Structure formats: C-alpha cells, structure tokens
Amino acid sequence: MRVPSLSVLSFLLGTALAAASNFEAGLLSSGKVSLGDWKSAHEKASQFVAKLNTTEKIKLITGSSVTTTNGETFTALDILDGDMGAQAYYYVSAFSLSSALAMTWDKEAMYEQGRAIAAEFYGKGIQMVAGPTSQPLGRTPWGGRLVESFGPDPYLNGIATGLETRAYADVGVIAGAKHFILNEQETNRTGGMGGGGGAPGGGGMGRGAEFSSSVPGGMSPTSSAGAIPSSTSTPGGSGMGGGMAGSSAFSSSSSSGAPYSSNADDKTLHETYLWSFYDAVHSGLGGVMCAMTKVNGTLSCQSSSLLLDILKTELGFPGMVWPDTNGQQDALASAANGLDYGSSSLWSESTIEGYLESNNITEARLNDMAIRNLMGYYYVNLDNGTQPSTAAQDDYVDVRANHAKLIRSHGSKSMVLLKNKNNTLPLYKPHKMAIFGSHARAAVAGPNMQFSVEGSGPTYDGHIATDSGSGQASLPYLITPENALNIKASQDGTMLRWIANDTYSSSTGSALVMQGSSSTSVTPSVSAYSENMDVCLVFINALAGEGADRTELRNTDQDNLINEVADNCDNTVVVINTVGARILDSWIEHENVTAVLYGSLLGQESGNSIVDVLYGDVNPSGRLTYTIAKTESDYNVDICYTAQCNFTEGNYIDYRYFDAYNVTPRYEFGYGLSYTDFAYSNLHIQGPSALSTYPTGQLAVGGYEDLWDTVAKVTVTIRNAGSLDGAEVPQLYISYPDVAKQPVRQLRGFHNVYIKKGQSTKVTFELRRRDISYWDVQHQKWAVAPGTYEAWVGASSRDLRTHGSFVVKTKA
C-alpha cells in the first residue's frame, strides 16, 4: 500500500485583532454545548463570578484568591506535576511513569493508579494535577518526553488518558491534561537549539509550571498545547484558521519567544492528535495546558481555532485553558483567543480594563474566563470543604496508604517479555548467578537527585525508576534489582557475583579485588565473571526527559557489555528499562541471549517488580505500546531542527507507517510473550444497523453525544492452552473502506484478561461510533463510511489470530 503524500503546508499568521464575529466563540453562556453533569458546576461558578467586580475577576484569572462582596472566598488553586506522584513532596509515593502504565494494557490498572495518585494529591491539599500527559504522542522515537505519555497509538492513549482523568475527578481532584497539541519534541521548543524551559513566562503564577519543583508556592503554567492557523492545503479551509490575534509582531504587552511550529493538516490533527483529548474531555477534564510551541504558525496558547473553535466548541470542553512555560506571549492575543488563566505581568488590571474599554475583549469573554477557572473546582466538589489544608512540601503528612503494593503490581504487569528461548524464564533457584550493568544498582546519590538532562549522557549511571523535569516522581526509597536479587539469593541459597557497571577493565585501582582462597578467587573481568554461571543477568537503561530529545536509540557500551557476557555465558538474560524505543539488533540474535525483559520506568518498587517477573511470581502480560525497529533508519520521522516542522507523514506514525510500507520490525506494536500459551477461536460480530453518515446527537461535553454510542460488538473466545495461569491481552484491529483513507489497520479495542490454565473466557469488544468514523475535512465532521469493515483479533498488530468483517450502510 502506498500512503498518500501530504503536501507541505504554508501558513500565514493572522494580524487582525479582536474580530467581532469571534466574540461569542467558545463561550459557555452561548448554549452551543450541552453541559450535562457539568451544569451544576456552571451554575455555581456563574453565581460566584456574578458577585465579582472587574478587578476581582482579573485576580481570579491570574491565580490570586478572591473574596466576593458578601464574603465568599475562593482560594487560588494549587496545581502540581504530575501523573507519577506529587512532585517535590515528602511522604508521597513514586508511581510508575505513564508509559509503563500503558504497557500493562490493563484498564483496571490505569484507573487504579489514577485514583491512588489523586488520593495523595488530595491528602496534601493540592487541588489540580498537571496531568494526565497525553502528549507528546510519539511522532518520532527520538522525542525526549515520550516516557511521560501513553504512547503513539491514539486509541490506546485515549483510553488511558480518559481513565486517568475519570479517576482524578472521582477522588475530587481536577485533571489538567497536557500538552495541547502537536508538541512532539523538545528541540527548539523555546526557539533556541536546546529544549530550554523551566521558568514561568511571567509573574503571579504560583506552583504548577513545568519543572515545578523549582518554582515556589502558588500556581504556574505547565505543559504544552497547540493552535492551528489556516492551511492552504486544507479543503474548505474551515476549522484551521489562525484566529484573531495571531500576529508574530508582539505588542508592548508581549514576552519574547520563537518556538518551532508543528504544521499538520486537519485530517491528521483530528484522527491522530486530537483523539485522546476527546477521551479526556468526555471523562471529566477540568483543565487543559496549551503548549509553548506553535501549530501551523500560531502559538498554541493564542490560537482561536484551536482553543475556541476546536477545544471549547467541537470538543465541548467546559474547563480552563492555562499556558505552559512561555506559552503566553501576547496579552491580547491570548485573552481574545481562548486562554483562561495567565500571567499577571501580562494581564495586569490596567491592561485588561483597557481591552474592555476598547472592545478588544468583551465583558462576556472576561466572565467566561473567570467561570472556567472555577468549573473544575465545582465539578469535583472541592467546594464541600472536606479537603485537608495545603501541606508544606516537607510536612509530615503521610498519604501513601498501601500504594507500594499497587506500584509493585503495576510495575510487574507492565514488563514485556520479548524473548524466552528454551523457557529460560522464569528462574528457579539458580545455584550461581552473575549480575552486570550499572542499572542493577542504585546511583551514588539518591533516590532523588536534581540533574540537567540537556547535554547529559543517554544512559543513567544507576537504576533509573523515574524521569526528570516534569516527569520526575519523588522517590521515598528505591528498590533496585540488586536489592531484590540479594533477598532472593538469601532465600534460595544462590551464589551471586556482580559487576555493577556498563564498562569495566581490570586496571590498577579497580574496585574488584582478588581475595580469598583459590577456590573462590576470580580474575576481575566481565568474561571471567560470566563463565560457568547458571544464569547471567545484564541490566541496561536509557535516559531522556524534559529539555532535550534523545541522541541515540542504542548504546555502544551497553551493547558491548551484553555481547561480552553472552560470549561467555550460555544463559544470558537482558533486562531493559528505557524511556522509549531501544534498538536491540547488535545482540538480540546472539545464541546465548536466551531471554529479554523490557519495560519503562517503574517507580519506587522497580527492583521488586522486575524480580517478580524474572522468578515467575508474576506471569508477564505487558505489551509494547510502540514499534521496536531493526535499525534507526526504519523509522520515518526524525527530530526537526528547523523553525517549520511539517508533519508530512500525516497519520502514518509508528506501526501504521510500518504496516503501510511493509517494513518488518524487530518487535511490533502490541507484542509481548507469556510463560503460557493462548488460543483464539469463535469470532462473532454483531454489526450495526444503518447509521447516519454524520452524528445527529446534541453537541455536548466530549463532542456530539452519539459519537460515544456503541454501534457494533466483536466477541472472541480465548483459551489458556499452556501449563501456567496467566493473563492475555487480546487486541482488536479494524480496517476501513477505502473512501475513509485510513491506515491498513488501527487498534480499536483491547482487554487484559486473566485465565487459569486449561480454561477459556469470552471477550467482547464494543465499537463506538467514533471508532469507525473518519474526519471529513470538507464537511468538518466525523463521518461513517459505507462499505465493508474488516476486523482482526490477535496478540499483537501483526500476530492476528482470527478475522471477520461487517458491512455498514449509511443514510442521510
């Protein structure tokens, strides 16, 4: 199949400010969006704002506490990173990163972790999480922050984002999803060749910005979001306009900055990058962080098209939009075009009052901004007065409960078994074991250590269990593999040796000293330590994070270590924890590399989670959330080093690209082995009756209501045909009729089901209307194509075990 090429888009920044026709766009008071269960929150917020004067409204939208004329007080929200735990706090848990959670493919785990994180935020008196982190999605595997998000597949990412959003709201904490939108790399995100970031774009914005651990008190802007000016290649041109105050010539009420522009067409924007934000809004999202970067030439936080037309109208988003660091650069452009919370240095009282007097913004717009700042607060019932007061970072307020058990369990569920030759794993009481690699042990300082990612090496000298920047958890302690393996060895009577470094030579001054009798002394070298072992474990990692993109997808020192161990040990097991895709081909086919266990960053219980899988206390059920290629050149998108980053690949990223161009991966999206075997049978499809081409329901929070209706069901029977109990992850892939112009196959359902040996279970996938819709650019609507839809169910995107089809007839 040949992917239709997408022309490189050219864009113009709009210069007209405050067009009168846009004054009503995106206003909650317009009644265009049915608020559903947000109605009560809107009534309360509107009543509160009605009691404020202009000065008080301006204080509210710039992060200050306000008191009404009759004495009602709203205390400014505390916003904090992130979706791996309360950053920079004591007596909190360090959860696995979002990328690890996604690798569980377990909806219950996704919701459980969201509830646990929210409970800790709530207990610390923090009202809003700067999360979930839906994007960067994963356009390129070199992206520096992919470890923070749920992966490049829109459906999987959307399910995880929605479940975490719902979990936060159910506990009573506001979810603030980021980064909106097309913020797919760190390079040039602030206009320089480096990643930059860290400092708020203006004053008066308390805690909440990216790198919030270095920002004292209050509330500040955090993650990224995007905006889209008009594209000459977009049919009809609608839905892609740059908006009112889109000028790059900043006024005196501007802050400087020139980040890259992500240039994507309307179809790509909707079908790949907006998908997960639909899930979040539908699930109770109270905040959206707009990115510091541009989309189609306009700053994301200053685009009426993105914020007013798409987010607040098309998606029906009822909450507030706040900026990532440096995302707000022009006072009027941001105020007029959809930003709701901003910097007091730009939105001063005199500035906003001047805009009102000159009719550059209306009173209705100011009221809407103020109301949206309160919507999430009332929606999650923070007004009930039961939340504890805000704790200082080092106060002894222990909110961890039994979360360590959950973290350990989710970590082990996320580990992916890539290779298991001759059933090497699980291990059973080996007599002699050797451990290699710095990733097996703790770093020399820790468990929390501030360091700069930009300019640092691509690996971490120690066991890496959390990220840096906004993705860094506050580790109360860290269980390393070395810790957990020593405990196992003491229980099993295993003899251990280790070289806890990635490089080693037996030169003078070596830390390895020959001592003991001739029966126990060993020449201090990797080859000597790996000889005559029952099993050799090699631990490797990869480092990346906010502020810089990855410089390599493999590491020479680590690969040399693996090959040297495998040359001397006929049972070499490699354990990898990485921030993204890792090329394995320099050693994966080595005959002595018998097993490979692969995962993301697992939090405080990391070593226990890994060892639980190595020894079979947990049967692995993790699955890849991205494609591992055979070589770097097999990926189709690199980091963009220019000011204009054109998304000419369209929807074809990760497995959708590999499938379209018949590129054979090393390990495909959705791949993962188990210690047992599963068989698939009895596929049955209950197809839809005739469907309207376009949605006919009411425009509501999360888009048109009937987008979420179940229109078809696919059922399959799965049998555990092996000798061990275990969990399988059946995956549903759909192909569309040609008129929809879609990838070869797309994920449209998954489950993680535990099945005892010899038993069977029936699994049902429910297809929603949106799951079989495509974006009709001409009509600016989600459309269902008439014709035959193919359905495959299998164990990965390429291991498809059973197949069927259904026909959809459409009506006007």
UniProtKB/Swiss-Prot annotation:
SUPFAM superfamilies: (Trans)glycosidases, Beta-D-glucan exohydrolase, C-terminal domain. Residues 1-18 form the signal peptide. Residues 211-225 have a biased composition (Polar residues). Residues 186-248 are annotated as: Disordered. Residues 191-207, 236-245 have a biased composition (Gly residues). GO terms for cellular component: extracellular region. Its EC number is 3.2.1.21. One of its GO terms (biological process) is cellulose catabolic process. One of its GO terms (molecular function) is beta-glucosidase activity. Glycans are attached at residues 53, 188, 296, 360, 384, 422, 501, 592, 646. The keyword Nucleotidyltransferase does not apply. The keyword Secreted applies. Pathway: Glycan metabolism; cellulose degradation. The active site is at 324. Pfam families: Fn3-like, Glyco_hydro_3, Glyco_hydro_3_C. It is found in: Secreted. Keywords: Carbohydrate metabolism, Cellulose degradation, Glycoprotein, Glycosidase, Hydrolase, Polysaccharide degradation, Secreted, Signal. It catalyses: Hydrolysis of terminal, non-reducing beta-D-glucosyl residues with release of beta-D-glucose. SMART domains: Fn3_like. Its main location: secreted. Beta-glucosidases are one of a number of cellulolytic enzymes involved in the degradation of cellulosic biomass. Catalyzes the last step releasing glucose from the inhibitory cellobiose. PANTHER family: BETA-GLUCOSIDASE, BETA-GLUCOSIDASE D-RELATED. Belongs to the glycosyl hydrolase 3 family. This is Probable beta-glucosidase D.
